[in-house]
């Protein structure tokens, strides 16, 4: 699942620039967030590997000026790859321990980590989720108020809504988001609701 999301997000960015894929690319990660247990023996290592391959493909141009820059290409890809398992891990804590809906936790954690990536260790904002939507002029009006981070928040929110509609068999409760159902949820079974 981790690699599928990374490949789809890569395809949403240049050189392919198929921006609608950005709305479905995070869905495999949303499924991992919603599951009661992560699949596989070392799921966070697999997430790091998927993140590494994503950044390795995105940053391929770093090696072009001089052969010695290949070291920086690998090192930067390795550093940036840590953000994907960190995202899934923090969102899982919010969903399964704090009872926050995956629809809320996913965009908040993603945007927070994009902000951190833009300000920690030199600030690297390339290939943000909001950058995939530069052609969707109605959506990028959000950037007037919140910049590319706001656009990325909206894209991740929409992806989380789509991911929330998928059945995930082994969530910790019937709500699909990891939180125990509350009053309004019980009354609206069978309909799509954003809040658990």
Where are these regions (language model features)?
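Membrane-embedded alpha-helical bundles of multi-pass enzymes
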Residues: 1-174, 184-196
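Intrinsically disordered, low-complexity segments enriched in serine/threonine/proline/glycine
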Residues: 179-183
